[in-house]
UniProtKB/Swiss-Prot annotation:
UniProt protein name: Large ribosomal subunit protein uL10
Ribosomal protein among keywords: yes
Annotated Gene Ontology cellular component terms: large ribosomal subunit
Top-level division of the source organism's lineage: Bacteria
PROSITE patterns, per database record: RIBOSOMAL_L10 (PS01109)
Pfam families xrefs: Ribosomal_L10
Alphabetical UniProt keywords: Ribonucleoprotein, Ribosomal protein, RNA-binding, rRNA-binding
Gene3D superfamilies given in the database record: 3.30.70.1730, 6.10.250.2350
Family from the record: Belongs to the universal ribosomal protein uL10 family.
GO biological process annotation, one example: translation
Organism the protein comes from: Shewanella loihica (strain ATCC BAA-1088 / PV-4)
Paired cysteines (S-S): none
């Protein structure tokens, strides 16, 4: 079904608005995925703070012009699904990577983070970024281990002083 010019402009504006507020983007080929599976993916995406849209290539190229995701323009071939992470940079990559494992015919093409194109082979780099809570927990564990080590060294120095006296 052909889209009217007003509809095309609305789609471009919607995707452009999503791109401006996004931290990262992932492009995938959804050819062969059933409607039920796509509906499940969209539901999971909403819960994860990820915006997903299947858009015509010409429209998505216009939508990402002037954004950090312009580097993805070369990947807009064939059926294009674009996912923007709004809350965490790795959310869309993690979501689509897990979905691709479950679906044999779902292929991730590329991703973008801070204006850098990330090929599909390196998608793990983005998917494995810790969430804010995970990063905070890692930091606290580092601080805890550092203070425990300092405490042990202080006790060892105190023991050495008492032995010397």
């Amino acid at each position: 079904m052909a889209l009217r010019l007003e509809d095309k402009k609305a789609i471009v504006a919607e995707v452009n608005e999503a791109a401006k507020g996004a931290l990262s983007a992932v492009v995938a080929d959804s050819r062969g995925v059933t409607v039920g599976d796509m509906t499940g993916l969209r539901k999971t995406a909403r819960e994860s703070g990820v915006y997903i849209k299947v858009v015509r290539n010409t429209l998505v190229k216009r939508a990402v012009e002037g954004t950090d995701f312009e580097c993805l323009s070369e990947t807009f071939t064939g059926p294009t699904l674009i996912a923007f992470s709004n809350e965490h940079p790795g959310a869309a990559a993690r979501l689509l990577k897990d979905f691709a494992k479950a679906q044999g015919n779902f292929e991730i093409k590329a991703a973008a983070f801070e204006g850098e194109l990330i090929p599909a082979s390196d998608i793990d780099r983005l998917a494995k970024l810790p969430t804010y809570e995970e990063a905070l927990a890692q930091f606290m564990m580092t601080m805890k281990e550092a203070s425990a080590g300092k405490f042990v060294r202080t006790l060892a120095a105190l023991r050495d002083q008492k032995e010397a006296a």
